[in-house]
A protein has these predicted regions:
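A glycine/proline-hinged amphipathic helix-loop "lid/cap" segment
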Residues: 1-111, 353-356
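Alpha/beta-hydrolase superfamily serine-hydrolase fold, recognizing
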Residues: 6-24, 42, 94-356
Length: 356
């Protein structure tokens, strides 16, 4: 019978969050050695060694995916996993949960404001989670950091999830939320009606689709912040095959999402409602794009950024060469991830404020 590695035993006894914070304080070389000792089987020389350790531990625990067929269980598991790594939240002057009475139905949202007495621009944020998991709580720390360091209000939207809801229904709610914020800009103290859309992964997909749908409307998004968004269910690019295993997002995950979100709702894989890379790219607002090198979505996002430039859209594309999909969620336990999130927040605001 094989013995449990001491680190695995420590993580099991102390909990994932405590164990991850302990790993975060180890030197990079020690993290590399630990990942090797835990038999991490993949060769990704430039990947953050802290992430390698986390992935090695996940594999040792028999977890190769963060979602699975049992959607109800996947939701509970994801919430528990995110709760386990949460630390003390970044302080903010105002954080409140509010109800949005939309045309498509009432939903919850979380409003973050770093200076409630001031008028500030707003970012509408749509959380990631493969369209089927995730919540206001799972992305709370990211939204706090974004509000503080971009000096903006953030409205995080609790949109309905698949498979219970179709892409059309989900997108409609997300677009209605943007329209609601615009209609209530005076009450919300939104500076000069400046409202951007943002999201990570599946949320980045929704932000992209909403931005496309809002072009020419009174509530059109003024900017986009897209963090490793899902943009193309139809095509497979080199990064898909290079990084399809042993990381946060796997080929297995993408195939499951494709089936539950797209195919089960009788959508074509290249329908712009689910694959916005095939949508109308004219007159889109300035777009700040984030990719992680070790992400199977890397190439499709890079291609989209290139397409936007070809259509005259002002684009800034930042690639984090040592990161993988989902790294913004590691900010509570990773000094490097937190540094990157703060950098993204500050640089996005500078980009947004810059004149053409």
């Amino acid at each position: 019978m094989s013995q449990t590695h001491p680190v695995m035993k420590y993580v099991q006894e102390k909990g994932q969050g405590f164990g991850a914070r302990m790993l975060n304080h180890m030197p990079g070389m020690a993290q590399e050695a630990l990942a090797k000792a835990l038999d991490y089987p993949y060769i990704y020389p430039d990947l953050d060694p802290f992430v390698k350790c986390l992935m090695a531990i996940q594999l040792k625990q028999g977890k190769s995916s963060f979602i699975h067929e049992d959607v109800a269980k996947a939701r509970v598991d994801f919430i528990q996993q995110m709760k386990a790594i949460q630390g003390k939240p970044t302080p903010l002057k105002m954080v409140e949960d509010i109800r949005l009475p939309l045309h498509s139905g009432t939903i919850m949202a979380r409003h973050y404001h770093p200076a409630p007495q001031k008028k500030l621009p707003m970012i509408m944020f749509y959380h990631g989670g493969a369209f089927m998991v995730g919540s206001l709580d799972t992305h709370d720390e990211f939204c706090r950091l974004l509000a503080v360091h971009a000096k903006v209000q953030v409205l995080s939207v609790a949109y309905p999830l698949t498979p219970e809801y179709s892409p059309l229904q989900i997108v409609q709610v997300c677009e209605d939320a943007l329209a609601w914020a615009h209609q209530n800009s005076k009450t919300l103290k939104i500076y000069k009606n400046r409202i951007a859309v943002a999201g990570d992964s599946a949320g980045g997909n929704l932000a992209t689709v909403v931005a496309q749908h809002s072009v020419g409307k009174s509530y059109a998004a003024r900017a986009q912040l897209l963090l490793y968004p899902v943009l193309d269910f139809k095509s497979r690019h080199p990064s898909f095959y290079a990084y399809k295993e042993g990381l946060v997002l796997s080929e297995e995950d993408v195939n499951l999402v494709s089936r539950l979100y797209v195919e089960n709702h009788q959508m074509a894989l290249d329908d712009p409602l689910v694959s916005p890379t095939y949508g109308n790219l004219k007159q889109l607002p300035p777009t700040y794009v984030i990719t992680a090198q070790h992400d199977l979505l890397h190439d499709e996002v890079s291609i989209y950024a290139h397409k936007l430039r070809q259509h005259g859209v002002r684009v800034y594309h930042k690639n984090y060469v040592d990161q993988t999909h989902g790294f913004i969620n590691l900010s509570p336990i990773s000094k490097r991830a937190k540094k990157y999130v703060i950098e993204i927040a500050r640089d996005f605001r500078k980009f947004w404020d810059k004149r053409n």
